[in-house]
Amino acid sequence: MDIKAILANLEAKHPGEHEYLQAVTEVLHSIEEVYNQHPEFEKARIIERMVEPDRIFTFRVTWVDDKGEVQTNLGYRVQFNGAIGPYKGGLRFHKAVNPSMLKFLGFEQTFKNALTTLPMGGGKGGSDFDPVGKSDAEIMRFCQAFMLELWNNIGPDTDVPAGDVGVGGREIGYLFGMYTKLAREYNVGVLTGKGATWGGSILRPEATGFGALYFTEHVLKTAGKELKGCTVALSGFGNVAWGAALKATELGAKVVAISGPDGVCEIPAGITKEMIDYMLEMRASNRNKVEDMATKYPELAKFTPGKKAWSVKCDIALPCAFQNELNGDDAKELIANGTWCCCEVSNMGCTPEAIETFQKSGILFAPGKAVNAGGVSVSGLEMTQNAMHISWSGAEVDEKLHYIMESIHSACVKYGKKADGTIDYVKGANIAGFMKVAQAMLEQGIV
């Protein structure tokens, strides 16, 4: 495999798409050795086909705000790879959304979904619509307008969107309601992340954070350590960070920091159950300010503007917000403060420089495509329940989530174990996901 030639070709065709090219570069370097052991992959041009999406839908979304003024946004759906199942991946509503971001997310989703053991291809979508400061009515009208353009390209056996940044249970409800109106059928399998009373799965809101902590437990256990008693700093205060904080606390860790775009809240005594519950209120307010936590609980939390969670002394760092949120300087600051483990809960939450710094320093590090796979895993379980017209209990879903995260960890260890006995989780996750997708593509012919 000529990595330089492949990347040069991609850069020429997709100039300026930095996130997408970053994601592809990481995977290619991880799989180069194993890829070169399979000449049949080279003959079928598996890599050249795998790094390009099957198709991308781009559309205008026109809606009316509360002042009666017409607004327009761009909407996208990237159907990246469907070799092992229907396209599956979230919808992101954020002002920074662009094709590069969604292609990177769709590419990562392909490998993540392959790791879950479930039959799901990779996809991603969203819009540059900014929900911050919007009323509930405006969000509803936007979701309806978005689905008006998307509905004919999705379906339970074609492409199954879900939530992501800016898209939670409320938005999924509005999207599903409009889909039902347009399609004139009640097909619960077309979206996941639905309410538990109308086709959703119990534990889906918590799944990404819960799964991340289950995976982190396996990472620590393999290294001869345990989570109980550890201090944890995490970024964000949305659905993912909420689930991570909740499960970390349940498992005996102490969450000492959460952060937002405005700064960091340090919580020396550890976050409480009431504070964790308040995280959901903060996100629902659309204010996007973590300072609200310190305002609500001034005796427990101290807010520092302009700082990141990585400035707070901790044992374990959990990036839970956005791509490239933890850079090389942040990694050095964490190491200087005694951090010995970082597990990405956000997609590509660490820059290449940060990952290199962690790995060279012997810090335990695991990538998002493995760590945060619990969310899409329970989405896959929701698809199964919808197809069978049944509903599993929370205990049943949690048991299956435990099994999936353990299986993902085992796959990472299988392909990432080094001669000295340590685990390269980045390499392990990339190879495990790649081998499954590549074999499926090979067996299905040149299509």
Predicted regions and their residues:
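Adenosine-phosphate binding glycine-rich loop
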Residues: 2-23, 219, 333-447
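Flexible, glycine/charged-enriched surface loops at secondary-structure junctions
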Residues: 18-21, 37-44, 117, 154-163, ...
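Structured beta-strand/loop patches that form or line metal/cofactor-binding pockets in enzymes
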Residues: 40-71
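Phosphate-interaction motifs
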Residues: 59-120, 124, 128
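Glycine/serine-rich phosphate-binding loop and adjoining beta1-alpha1 elements at the start
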Residues: 94, 113-228
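Glycine-rich phosphate/diphosphate-binding loop of Rossmann-like nucleotide-binding domains
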Residues: 192-195, 200-313
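Rossmann-like adenosine-cofactor binding region
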Residues: 263-365, 370
